[in-house]
Amino acid sequence: IYLAGASMAGFVDGETVSMRDLLYGAVVPSGAEATEALAQAVAGSEEAFVTMMNEKAAALGLTSTHFMNTSGLHDEDHYSTVREIALILQAALQNEVCAEVLSAENYRASRTEQHPDGLAMTNKFLYRVHHEYSLGGAEITAAKTGYTAEAMNCCASAGKTPDGRSVICVTANAWTGEFCIEDHIALDSKYCGSAESE
């Protein structure tokens, strides 16, 4: 995963890390080393965990989703659709721990010998949305971004409209991370209320 250029949370070889810290490391900064460590801890190998991922996708009724790895790196047989990613996010948010992690703007991992102050992480999408935009009464409460050269910048977000309705938005193929944010803000503005940059 290092050689493939995957994004990392910052954990290092030999570091003892809790499952909680790995979960945050996998989601908040999209740490591929965290997803691989979680897979090893839960299923014994990445391959076995990917099998579990595909079984879960089938249990959710997804017919256009297939996983080949835990990092999201490109593979011709690793694919989904924006609709099915929305269904995955909807299911994840029903899990209390997943909802907490997906909603975290910032997180600091426990102190370790390698990171005496704890590894600091930021969900840059949520940070930008929360601090640089006014959403006109609507709220983006959770988000997970992703990037590959093939899919470009993608994001799945969840939020609330001013009248309290739950909304999930999934976008793909944005040229930059900034465009990805602007896509979500534009959709929020159109369907959930006004949104203005501060």
Enumerate the language-model features and the residues they cover.
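Alpha-helical scaffold elements that line and support the substrate/ligand-binding pocket
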Residues: L22, A26-A43, F49-M53, I85-I88
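Penicillin-recognizing serine hydrolase domain
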Residues: G44-E198
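A short acidic, often aromatic-flanked loop/helix-cap motif at beta-alpha or helix-coil junctions
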Residues: I1-Y2, D75
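Conserved catalytic neighborhood of penicillin-recognizing serine enzymes
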Residues: Y2-E36, P116-Y133, I140
